[in-house]
């Protein structure tokens, strides 16, 4: 560790965090190019294919806040390594053992859980190992790697399907994840919160419930209809859970998500822009690959 608190191998660590982040982001999109082959091989209909794609996003998005908070409390390196192991194991299981759409959906859900451990841990580790004066540049590089993960995923997925089969889309994850695991074990330092703040189990439950119901409604609405009773009920539940989550986080001393962040216009507008761009990009890719 240098005098200013910076880790002497921080740029190597940033490279490892970037690689880990790319693994998370490319798994959002690699499968899209394999959907036609999977539809034939697994006899999957459009609803099955949508769940194969979205089970990853549902668990990933629903568990992201909780896994980030647990990683900060119990150890960011542990969270990173555990998440990569889950991603690699689920990828191998899908490649070698999945023979139905349900098998792939379960594997993708497990991958989403692993990704929810990895992504927040990578950012937290970057923040810890870089001094304040270099932190903005490091986070900018981290953000850039998140952005290029999707196009890399399309290229990798296209190559795998063109030259092999849809199973290779999963199998290709394994050596990349092994590389990230080994490099992480060697170079990434252990870190966690210095001050043991109380856990927020109620906030964790409400965040998972709110994000899960929102994502479920968005996933199922195209097939069930936006005005169907089920979607309206789930949408209403999502609003209630979101309201309860926000009010709970406002009222406790150590919130899992400080609501005050949303008062900053740049933060809020940036989130809205990312959300809209993601909706457009992933909707386009899903419909065009079928």
Functional labels for PLM-detected ranges:
Residues 10-17, 80, 104, 199, ...:
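Hydrophobic alpha-helix/TM-entry signal in multi-pass membrane transporters
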Residues 35-38, 126, 160, 188, ...:
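Hydrophobic alpha-helical interface/terminus motif in multipass membrane transporters
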Residues 2-186:
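Transmembrane-helix bundle of Major Facilitator Superfamily
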Residues 2-4, 181-208, 250-265:
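Flexible interhelical linker loops that connect adjacent transmembrane helices
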Residues 174-193, 208-220, 236-251:
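C-terminal membrane-cytosol helix-exit motif in multi-pass small-molecule transporters
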Residues 31-34, 54, 67, 122, ...:
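Hydrophobic/aromatic residues in alpha-helical transmembrane segments
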Residues 14-23, 31-33, 229-237, 241, ...:
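12-transmembrane solute porter fold
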Residues 40-41, 216-227, 256-259:
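Membrane-interface helix termini and inter-helical loops of multi-pass transporters
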């Amino acid at each position: 560790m240098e005098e200013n608190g910076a880790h002497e191998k921080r740029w190597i660590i940033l490279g490892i965090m970037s690689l880990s982040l790319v693994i998370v982001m490319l798994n959002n999109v690699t499968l899209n190019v394999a959907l036609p082959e999977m539809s034939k091989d697994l006899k999957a209909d459009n609803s099955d294919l949508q769940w194969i794609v979205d089970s990853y996003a549902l668990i990933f998005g629903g568990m992201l806040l909780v896994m980030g908070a647990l990683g900060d409390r119990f150890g960011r390196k542990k969270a990173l390594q555990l998440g990569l192991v889950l991603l690699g194991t689920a990828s191998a299981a899908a490649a070698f053992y999945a023979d139905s759409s349900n098998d792939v959906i379960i594997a993708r859900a497990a991958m989403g859980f692993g990704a929810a451990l990895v992504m927040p841990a990578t950012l937290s580790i970057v923040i810890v190992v870089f001094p304040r004066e270099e932190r903005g540049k490091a986070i900018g590089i981290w953000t850039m790697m998140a952005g290029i993960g999707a196009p890399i995923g399309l290229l990798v997925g296209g190559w795998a399907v063109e030259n092999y089969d849809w199973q290779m889309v999963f199998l290709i994850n394994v050596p990349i994840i092994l590389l990230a695991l080994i490099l992480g074990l060697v170079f990434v330092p252990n870190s966690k919160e210095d001050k043991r703040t109380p856990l927020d189990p109620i906030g964790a439950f409400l965040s998972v419930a709110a994000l899960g119901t929102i994502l479920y409604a968005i996933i199922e609405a195209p097939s069930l209809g936006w005005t169907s009773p089920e979607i309206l009920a789930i949408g209403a539940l999502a609003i209630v859970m979101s309201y309860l989550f926000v009010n709970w986080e406002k009222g406790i001393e150590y919130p899992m998500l400080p609501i005050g962040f949303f008062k900053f216009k740049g933060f809020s507008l940036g989130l809205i822009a990312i959300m809209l761009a993601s909706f457009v990009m992933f909707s386009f890719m899903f419909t065009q690959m079928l």
